[in-house]
Amino acid sequence: MGIISHSIVQCGKWQAGPARRQVVFRVHRRCFKMSEALRHLKNGETDLSSLPSGLDSIPRRIHTARGVDDSFSYRHPVLPQVVVLSDAFCVCLAVVACIAWQRIYDTPDELSGALLLANIMAAGAFFLFPKNVPLLDIPDITKVSVQIRYLLPPVAFGEVVFCTVLVMLSWPFGVTVRMGMEWLTFVVAILFVERCVGTYILHTPTMTRRLARKVAIIGSGSEATQMATRINTRMQRMFRLVGTFDDQGGDSDGTVEELVLRAREDHIDAVIICFPPACGQQHVMDVLWRLRGVLADVYVVPSLMTEDCHGWPVERFGPFSLTVLQRRPLSEWDMLEKRAFDLTASVLLLLALAPLLTLVALAIKLDSRGPVLFCQPRQGFNNRYFNVFKFRSMYTDMSDLDAARQTSRTDPRVTRIGRWIRRLSIDELPQLFNVLRGEMSLVGPRPHAPQTRAGGQLLHEAMEEYVARHRVQPGITGWAQINGSRGELVTRDDLCRRVVLDLEYIRAWSIWLDIKIIFLTIKREIFSRNAF
């Protein structure tokens, strides 16, 4: 949130140095009314004096910190949800097996409907019963006592519902104890087999390496050494140390800048800042500023946060209690959910739009010489480069792969068909193939070519917060586009408005927001006046 707020500050007085960063992270710990700021920005009021007054008096952000206890466990971001889905599948399988068994056992026809309804309602009761999902942490998921605590209440509740429904619907025909025990036996047996298989899989070396979170430590001295030693000895099943980094050199594996570059190539889940207490909080804030584009959770030893830090959440990280400074914008589960939606929607769209795509390709081929598709390098997720697909809308000998010159409304490089498909945004449709390849999402910040400039500067130079856009997959459309921020980036203010909207989308992401943006794109943006 602090990066979003600072994006607005960036639109006004262009400051630099530690003083500006201190302002940024003060705002980072406060709730900022983005709607008011966006309203002023849309009206063209980019000076700080035009923003709502009292920015420094905004109430402190409220965090609901996870309880800190002495348990030596670690919450994997995806595993609990996978176990819940596996339980749901097993219960459905148990219901099917129970119904099949009851038919084989020559159940009276009068009871068939009642048994079917009782099985279904019991399964629903199991799903709806509140479960203690934190009990699915590593290594608790392999403990029998913990799993009994997790499974016993919903199974018992499902059994009660089964028996109650069966008695209410079939009391004239009589109900035997056997019928009540059948549901319980099948559910318990299948869940038991599931847990045995799951425990075996979790203990395999391959799965252990996959589930372990990759951790990097920033710092030097005894504190960093102690942290690294503990991770390498007592926490090997939960965490894997990728290295220690520090600008002072010594025995470290590189500098902070080298860590930032390495994070682009090698997935890193968490970064722990572990400086000696003498370094102070300001040094921590400077390092956090340099990590603003890193796709990882950032923690710090609480002893370094001595100044006005009680608003920051504290989490258990193995045996350590660490202060959370920065979170990944989307969890692994959120990313899986978004990816599943992208794949499903893009396949359906390609099938539905196949006739239109064929006609457009034929028109481009007849209109001018050259290929139908145009590939251009763009900077995407985690600052990695990929080739984006578009319908060719320019003459082949005038194409600009690096986008050193942005397209203008009366650009002579655009063909006749190209002007039409650009106006209707049809030239972007081949990017559905980028979505299938995993390089893009349907909704997200629009990717830019490496040499795109705003106000005569490269985008990442014109606005330091620009790199934070790359912490999520780029999209075919986005929140900025449906709010009118598209087209040519002429000034830094144009870039600022777009980045503010992109970061607001990242902060507020949900599947429903993606669906809303897609429908608003169809409604508003296809005939946008800013498209050319």
UniProtKB/Swiss-Prot annotation:
Pfam families: Bac_transf (PF02397), CoA_binding_3 (PF13727)
GO biological process: polysaccharide biosynthetic process
Entry-linked InterPro entries: Bact_transf (IPR003362), EPS_sugar_tfrase (IPR017475)
This protein's UniProt keywords: Exopolysaccharide synthesis, Glycosyltransferase, Membrane, Transferase, Transmembrane, Transmembrane helix
Membrane-spanning intervals of the chain: 81-101, 110-130, 155-175, 183-203, 344-364
Major enzyme class: transferase
Reactions mediated catalytically: di-trans,octa-cis-undecaprenyl phosphate + UDP-alpha-D-glucose = alpha-D-glucosyl di-trans,octa-cis-undecaprenyl diphosphate + UMP
Membrane topology: Multi-pass membrane protein
GO MF annotation terms: glycosyltransferase activity; undecaprenyl-phosphate glucose phosphotransferase activity
Superkingdom: Bacteria
The protein's Enzyme Commission number: 2.7.8.31
Localization per Swiss-Prot or TrEMBL: Membrane
GO CC, any one term: membrane
Function: Involved in the biosynthesis of the exopolysaccharide acetan, a water-soluble polysaccharide involved in production of bacterial cellulose (BC).
Family: Belongs to the bacterial sugar transferase family.
PANTHER family the record matches: COLANIC BIOSYNTHESIS UDP-GLUCOSE LIPID CARRIER TRANSFERASE (PTHR30576), UNDECAPRENYL-PHOSPHATE N-ACETYLGALACTOSAMINYL 1-PHOSPHATE TRANSFERASE-RELATED (PTHR30576:SF0)
Record protein name field: Undecaprenyl-phosphate glucose phosphotransferase
Taxonomic path: Bacteria, Pseudomonadati, Pseudomonadota, Alphaproteobacteria, Acetobacterales
Gene responsible for this protein: aceA
